[in-house]
Amino acid sequence: AIYIAFRLNYRSARRREEVRLSRDELTIKRTEVSGRTLSSRFNPFWTKLHVAKHPYAGVTSIAIASRGKRVTVGDFLNPEDRASFASAFGQALATVKRS
């Protein structure tokens, strides 16, 4: 049982997301457990941040959307870390849009 838990944790640790925001571009790069990498690019000026919250569970999902394209981020984070990321990213996106 411990081996199975360790193996599942090891596999999930290989999953990564990288979110890069500049004045010119927002890039989301997701590496899945299988090793497959998916990238999405957005114009930050047309991008909206969608944060779903539950009164007791906190932030349940974060999505970035622009022109009909929607990408979820941070699914693997706990609700507290999701809230922290959503706040920091929302502030960074607002700063880029003002510049």
Across the structure, where does each feature detected by a protein language model lie?
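Alpha-helical transmembrane spans
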Residues: A1-R15
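Membrane-cytosol interface motif
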Residues: A13-S39
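Short beta-strand or tight-loop elements
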Residues: D24, F45-T47, K69
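Beta-strand secondary-structure signal
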Residues: E18, T27, K48, S61-A63
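Pleckstrin homology
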Residues: T37-V59
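A membrane-cytosol interface segment of integral membrane proteins
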Residues: V59-S99
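A short, compositionally biased
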Residues: L21-D24, Y56-T60
